[in-house]
Amino acid sequence: MNFDMSKLMQQAQKMQEQMKKAQQERENMEVIGESGAGLVTVTMTGKYDVKSVSIDNSLMSEDKEILEDLIAAAVNNAVKKVEENSTASSDIYKMAKDAGIDLPSGINFPFK
């Protein structure tokens, strides 16, 4: 079996570029999580930063605990959407395969 170091380096560089692109796409992502049929919305970035919280005026007369629960649910919904829309971790396996590298399944990458 011939081992071509230059080909391996080219494949690794290609995979690194693809991973960088996937990370940038995630960083630029924005999602809106909601609860209470849209009465509470949370805008979150792909880096899990909450940019805004919107609470419908009709909830201002509600019990404090109800409002807290709705806010928590909206944040959790936004987190779920970031994870669902993030291509980074699933694309790593595809990128590695395209580069001729077999990764074992179940690896937890640090940016997932």
Curated annotation (Swiss-Prot):
Coiled coil: none annotated. It is found in: Cytoplasm, Nucleoid. Signal peptide: none annotated. Its main location: cytoplasm. Pfam families: YbaB_DNA_bd (PF02575). GO terms for molecular function: DNA binding. InterPro entries: YbaB-like_sf, YbaB/EbfC. Keywords: Cytoplasm, DNA-binding. GO terms for cellular component: bacterial nucleoid; cytosol. The keyword Secreted does not apply. Residues 1-27 are annotated as: Disordered. Residues 17-27 have a biased composition (Basic and acidic residues). Belongs to the YbaB/EbfC family. NCBIfam families: DNA_YbaB_EbfC. Homodimer. This is Nucleoid-associated protein FTW_0607.
